[in-house]
Amino acid sequence: MIVTLTPNPSIDRTVSISHLERGEVHRATASRVDPGGKGVNVSRALAAHGLHSVAVLPAGGAEGALLERLLTSTGVEVLPVPIGGSVRANVALVEPDGTTTKINEPGPTLSTAELSSLVAGAATALMRGPSWVVGCGSLPPGVDDELYAGLVRRARAAGVRVAVDTSGVPLARAVAAGPDLIKPNHEELAELVGAALPTLADVHTAAKSLLGQGVRTVVVSLGRHGALLVTDGLTAHGQAVVDQPLSTVGAGDALLAGYLHATATGSAPGAALAAGVAWGAAAVGLPGSRMPAPGDVHGIPVLLTHHPDLTLRLAP
């Protein structure tokens, strides 16, 4: 079992258009609605592969009720915390080549009591002895930047492995608490260390510096350049080619889910990275923020190396 905490979940509406032009009327060629938020996506991907996942999240308003229904229908166990506000709705505009323009609402403001209930829900889930607990995504307005750091400390005290996928100050605070795993993307890692990271060598150096701060594993998602895994005794790079990209929404979440699923079922870190890259590549080939099922992942070739070319320039 893997527990996810998503403080700012969403309803994700994905609209496909022929091209995006500012100031013009566009006709949709397709649309879909999915439960969203980083942790929600991780839970969805895990459930699609038969691993029990518990999603702890705030739920309010019509969007919150829809979120619960959609998420439960995917096989995820939902532990909702009732809130007075409404769950946010995000919109993604996707062009035929996979270019995605996202519009994300900030989310509802949680009261002190609602936030306390959310933290209590995560603590209750921790008592069930999961293989991992994962804190994911942005924080709603007004929520203290220490939220994920507190989750890390609680998980470590309970003897549960803990992963964090967020950005900015909440990520920096979580790093200081010493999580087992963080999964920033290229831009988030650059922001965290306060430096541009134009090459794979720069990314590697930045990731290694975080190990000295107490993080045990760093997985950096690099878009079309795959992902880099750095631990105290291992560096590995994995990459897969997507023939027909449809949407990048949720691809990093699928990568994280694949890595966690593999480690929870006994895989070594390198093999877990390969699994994560395959899951992420599969997600890019799917519409909207749909998470990949086993049939989507099967057969995706991943080039995995433990001696990557660190001179690789990471073009956007």
Show where each model-derived region lies.
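Short acidic, glycine-rich surface-loop motifs adjacent to enzyme active sites
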Residues: 127-142
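Glycine-rich phosphate/adenosyl-contacting loop at the front of the ribokinase-like
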Residues: 1-56, 65-66, 242, 310-316
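Short beta-strand scaffold segments in enzyme catalytic cores
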Residues: 44, 89-93, 226-230
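Conserved N-terminal subdomain of the carbohydrate kinase-like
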Residues: 47-130, 300-316
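Short, small-residue-enriched loops and turns at beta-alpha junctions
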Residues: 108-111, 139-143, 170-173, 191, ...
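Hydrophobic anchor at the start of a short beta-strand
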Residues: 2, 52-54, 78, 162, ...
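Conserved phosphate/ATP/ADP-binding segment of small-molecule kinases
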Residues: 146-162, 166-233
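Conserved phosphate-binding/catalytic region of the ribokinase-like
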Residues: 172, 200-316
